[in-house]
Amino acid sequence: DLVERTAIPVQNAMKDAGLKIGILSDFPPEQKGDIWGIRSLCDVCIGSEESGALKPSIYPFGILSKKLGVAPSEILYVGNSHKYDVLGANKAGMKSACIQTGFRKLFGIKIPDADISFKNYRQLQDIVLK
């Protein structure tokens, strides 16, 4: 499965807690949202064609912040790529969370520069909603 089966319940819990959710993708975000089954949970979906730039440029992250109506410093950007998601979000003034995969997940090795490294979405929920 592209998205871990706990991702949707976790996003529901985040929405129930009053958090906004957005998709920022270098690919058509509607397609990702529809494939993953999370489009209905998103407040904003932005792709590179709308932002005019690819991650890790700060421009797409700035557009995400503006469309969500939330200051960059108040956003936790969740991704799966150190280079594109973590570094891009950090440069834009956001906090970053990155899912651990492969040997990082197996051995609990933190993602460099990420404010939060997590093994699964339930763990992310526990950290964010504690």
Predicted segment positions?
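Metal-dependent phosphoesterase signature
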Residues: 1-5
